[in-house]
């Protein structure tokens, strides 16, 4: 639980610093963007629970003032980080809140399918779960942005774990 609170404090500190550092209002927030990202499901086991991958976000299917609803999907792999490699697929709805012309907070709530492929075995181990990962998104240019935030996940059998997600985004 201490990792969750430290992540939330870092997110808020980054928000206050970046709001003043990027005050140009000429950038409009994209409705669609793709990202390259690294995420970890557990702060205590970053290498073992981490994955690098790509995501597609459609963050503005519906809009009410500064609130948007949308969806997203992501695919990541943990190949080369540990002996037993795995992959994960996340998909689900998201809520976005605009903080200004360059910043928004995105809150995806995703179903998670995690598959591992043990070395030397033909068996595949699959688990389903749920992830919630609020991210602060900052757009440097109209087509390029960065994001980071905490990530909470559970596979419905064990306690929830807390990790992080970070990456770069490209609007299209």
Question: Residues of each region from the PLM?
Answer:
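Short, exposed beta-strand-loop hairpins at the edges of beta-sheets
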Residues: 144, 151-158
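A generic structural micro-feature
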Residues: 28, 48-50, 85-87, 124-126, ...
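Gram-negative (and chloroplast) outer-membrane scaffold detector with strong preference
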Residues: 54-146, 170-172
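Extracytoplasmic loops and strand-loop junctions of Gram-negative outer membrane beta-barrel proteins
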Residues: 37-41, 117-119, 149-151
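A short hydrophobic/aromatic micro-motif that marks alpha-helical segments and, especially, helix-coil
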Residues: 17-18, 116, 156-157
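Short glycine/proline- and aromatic-enriched beta-strand/turn motifs that initiate or cap beta-hairpins
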Residues: 19-82, 165, 169-171
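Cleavable N-terminal export/targeting peptides
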Residues: 1-30
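Compact, aliphatic and Gly/Pro-tolerant "microcore" segments centered on a short helix or tight beta-hairpin
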Residues: 147-150, 164, 168
């Amino acid at each position: 639980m201490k990792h969750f609170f430290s992540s939330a404090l870092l997110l808020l500190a980054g928000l206050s610093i970046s709001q003043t550092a990027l005050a140009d209002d000429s950038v409009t927030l994209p409705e669609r963007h793709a990202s390259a990202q690294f995420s970890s499901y557990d702060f205590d086991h970053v290498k073992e629970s981490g994955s690098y991958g790509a995501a597609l976000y459609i963050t503005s299917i519906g809009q009410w003032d500064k609130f948007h609803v949308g969806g997203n999907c992501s695919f990541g792999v943990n190949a080369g980080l540990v002996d037993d490699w795995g992959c994960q697929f996340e998909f689900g709805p998201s809520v976005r809140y605009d903080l200004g012309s360059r910043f928004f907070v995105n809150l995806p709530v995703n179903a998670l399918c995690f598959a591992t492929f043990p070395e030397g075995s033909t068996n595949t181990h699959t688990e389903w779960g749920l992830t919630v990962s609020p991210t602060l998104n900052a757009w440097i240019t109209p087509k390029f942005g960065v994001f980071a935030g905490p990530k909470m996940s559970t596979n419905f059998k064990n306690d929830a774990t807390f990790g992080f997600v970070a990456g770069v985004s490209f609007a299209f």
